[in-house]
Amino acid sequence: MKNFFSFSKLTPHLKNIYHRNMTYTTKQVGETGSLEYRLFFLKDNKPVSSFHDVPLWVNKEKQIVNMLVEIPRGTNAKLEIATKEYMNPIKQDVKDGKLRFVHDKYPFNYGALPQTWESPEHTHPSTGAKGDNDPLDACEIGSGQGVTGEFKQVKVLGVFAMIDAGETDWKILCIDVNDPIASQINSQEDIEKHLPGKINEVYTFLRDYKIPDGKGPNQFAFDGKLQSIDFSMKIIEETEAEWKDLVGGKTKSSLSVVNTTLNDSNTVTADVAAQKLNF
């Protein structure tokens, strides 16, 4: 996959998405539901990477992180961060030249935690498998439907140790801090009390969503049990450290690490990024 997607002939569409304590603008290139579709991010009208420039932590002591919504609840287009492309826009995954859709609609908002990375060079002792080369995934179980490109501030509630095609693929369970019942949910017991059956619903979906495509169920460490908040925080910290090794050049990778805010060897000015993107 090329590190830069050519879209000079496509018309960008500007859309504002407001976030708590920060405002991002998304710029869409190509039509939704097309191979050309890309959703780029700007802050203060300057290009930023959704992977590298948006901070992970909102309040570490309270286990609150930023989550980028890729696939809103109730939808099934397989949207994801384009980790190998310049400035890491969101795109729709492609398989055999066709846009990818999951058979069943997601029963939660699905997305990723910025400034995290599951290194394919690291075998995790809990799973016996190497990382899947992507940011940490997150499943947000609040009542509201997210929007693709929205950054939610979410409270960490647990993690599933999924093993997908032989690779470690952690799934953080979380809830939007602005959800009406977020303040009442601080443990697995609280989830079962206020959202009975939700943990099993998330687990079952993650386990079985590839079966209609002719594949077997995904595997899980810990017998598929949701792990504690403390364990989840350790996983987030580990993948944050692996991300730092990625952008710091300690781990070699084909992923794009270009950014506009980190002030490292991969940082470019906003003007350079905008020119490259034809913004």
Curated annotation (Swiss-Prot):
Signal peptide: none annotated. The keyword Disulfide bond does not apply. CDD domains: pyrophosphatase. Mg(2+) 1 binds at D132, D137, D169. It comes from Dictyostelium discoideum (Social amoeba). Belongs to the PPase family. It is an enzyme of class 3 (hydrolase). This is Inorganic pyrophosphatase. Mg(2+) 2 binds at D137. GO terms for biological process: phosphate-containing compound metabolic process. It catalyses: diphosphate + H2O = 2 phosphate + H(+). Keywords: Hydrolase, Magnesium, Metal-binding. Diphosphate binds at R100. One of its GO terms (molecular function) is magnesium ion binding. GO terms for cellular component: phagocytic vesicle. Its cofactor is Mg(2+).
